[in-house]
């Protein structure tokens, strides 16, 4: 009798749970059909999947196995893979060393080498431990502690831990010169970007550069920015390429604007070497040689040298928090290449992306065609990932020991924990939501090639996703 009662209780709970799931599925279906009927989309341009976070059971799906451009929602796959393969406590180490010898007068007959590890946070202002001036001062102090008063060699930024191709395949040329298109170096510095403020003039007249946050005196900056009407805002774009010696600024800067525009730095490793040389000179240490980046030196051979000091990055969990909260593309490219380097000893973005694809094929049997990754950030419009693949990887994360750190890294948007993605004609959201019935849900929603304004489509997507809260 007791067995019969317990069995009846179990099946009653199961029946109620299934009823909730069916009810939610019906609501999502109705909302999705309404979403599509409002115009601006075809059947093939919208994909949605919703599943139970604990069991993986699919609650609703539409076009979930169609490859879609993801924009920055791809960052969740990079984040989860990094947590899984590198660990929450992983840290990068940057080493400064010297070659040659130091004589009794304090002359170093050799070079100072800054050996990069791909750390994307070095010199970033997001963490107390990574502030650029503090790092320069610490290294300068360590050099002086060795009794070095003059360096008869060079200051070299060694960025050779990666392949030197800073920009992944498929990134639009118009993006590369701007802060969000900053390429990844083996020795990143100040998030590989520089801030510029302008002095507006009469409408249509040149807007002069007022201030630079970084010393770019070694570059040729061609400024073609004009003053725009009040209220027109920031329409300034930077144009450059990795390792270039010049930057072109075009567009308009609103007459009433008071804003810092950020552009990418063509050679971050050189910038760091340049800044350290300047800091040493300011502190009384003479440097006879030039600042240089390893990739631009002919026949550079890395030397072990004698260690002067090391710098450790924040933990991976701390890096991924800002990576997802502020959608920093540089962080994604550094993490992807780091995964490839640590797991497979490869240096390129393509090889690293292929390793990530192979990992999820082996771990979750996700077809390789469902994970068309060309970068780690989602900036490439040519990325193609199915909603099902992204959803399965996110659902997998729910059971992992580092899940709390990943969940914390997701922004709160529309009162939901999810990562957004936006590039031309593409909007996406991927995240987690608990329904009123207490069911924990994982979801991925993409729209591609939509018509109408981004703001309007975003609100329509929020309205659809709000059903998951019911």
Annotated model-derived regions:
Residues 1-26:
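Bacterial Sec-dependent N-terminal signal peptides
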Residues 21, 55, 119, 162, ...:
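Short, glycine-/Ser/Thr-/acidic-enriched flexible segments
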Residues 22-66, 93, 141-147, 467-470:
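Beta-lactamase-like hydrolase cores
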Residues 35, 85-367:
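Conserved serine DD-peptidase/penicillin-binding transpeptidase domain
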Residues 47-51, 59-61, 78, 95-97, ...:
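Soluble periplasmic/extracytoplasmic beta-strand elements of cell-envelope proteins
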Residues 56, 75-82, 155, 187, ...:
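Residue-level preference for non-acidic, small/hydrophobic
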Residues 59-61, 311-314, 326-329, 333-470:
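Small-residue-rich helix-loop
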Residues 61-81, 85:
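Short active-site loop at a secondary-structure junction
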């Amino acid at each position: 009798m007791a067995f019969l009662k317990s069995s009846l209780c179990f099946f009653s709970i199961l029946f109620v749970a299934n009823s909730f799931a069916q009810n939610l599925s019906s609501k999502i279906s109705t909302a999705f059909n309404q979403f599509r009927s409002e115009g601006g989309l075809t059947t093939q341009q919208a994909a949605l999947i919703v599943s139970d976070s604990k069991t993986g059971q699919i609650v609703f799906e539409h076009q979930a196995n169609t490859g879609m451009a993801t924009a920055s929602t791809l960052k969740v796959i990079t984040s989860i893979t990094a947590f899984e393969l590198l660990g929450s406590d992983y840290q990068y180490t940057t080493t400064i060393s010297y070659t040659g010898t130091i004589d009794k007068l304090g002359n170093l007959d050799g070079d100072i080498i800054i050996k990069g590890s791909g750390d994307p946070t070095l010199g970033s202002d997001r963490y107390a431990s990574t502030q650029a001036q503090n790092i320069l001062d610490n290294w300068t102090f360590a050099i002086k502690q060795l009794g070095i008063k003059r360096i008869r060699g060079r200051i070299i930024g060694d960025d050779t831990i990666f392949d030197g191709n800073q920009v992944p395949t498929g990134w639009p040329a118009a993006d590369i010169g701007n802060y969000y298109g900053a390429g990844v170096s083996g020795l990143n510095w100040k998030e590989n970007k520089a801030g510029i403020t302008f002095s507006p003039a009469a409408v249509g007249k040149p807007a002069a550069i007022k201030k630079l946050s970084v010393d770019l005196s070694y570059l040729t900056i061609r400024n073609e920015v004009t003053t725009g009407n009040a209220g027109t805002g920031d329409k300034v774009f930077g144009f450059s390429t990795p390792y270039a010696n010049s930057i072109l600024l075009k567009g308009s800067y609103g007459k009433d604007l008071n804003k810092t525009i950020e552009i990418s730095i063509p050679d971050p490793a050189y910038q760091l070497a340049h800044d350290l040389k300047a800091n040493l000179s300011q502190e009384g240490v003479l440097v006879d040689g030039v600042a240089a980046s390893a990739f631009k030196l002919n026949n550079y051979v890395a030397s072990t040298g004698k260690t002067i000091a090391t710098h450790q990055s924040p933990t991976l969990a701390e890096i991924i928090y800002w990576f997802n909260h502020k959608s920093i593309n540089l962080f994604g490219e550094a993490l992807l290449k780091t995964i490839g380097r640590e797991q497979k000893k490869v240096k390129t973005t393509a090889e690293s992306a292929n390793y990530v694809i192979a990992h999820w094929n082996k771990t979750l049997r996700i077809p390789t065609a469902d994970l068309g990754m060309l970068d780690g950030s989602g900036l490439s419009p040519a990325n193609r990932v199915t909603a099902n693949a992204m959803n399965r990887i996110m659902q997998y994360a729910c059971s992992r020991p580092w899940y709390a750190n990943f969940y914390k890294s997701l922004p709160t948007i529309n009162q939901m924990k999810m990562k957004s993605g936006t590039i031309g004609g593409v909007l996406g959201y991927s995240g987690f939501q608990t329904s009123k019935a207490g069911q924990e849900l994982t979801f991925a929603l993409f729209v591609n090639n939509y018509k109408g304004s981004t703001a309007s489509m975003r609100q329509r997507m929020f309205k659809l996703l709000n059903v998951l809260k019911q």
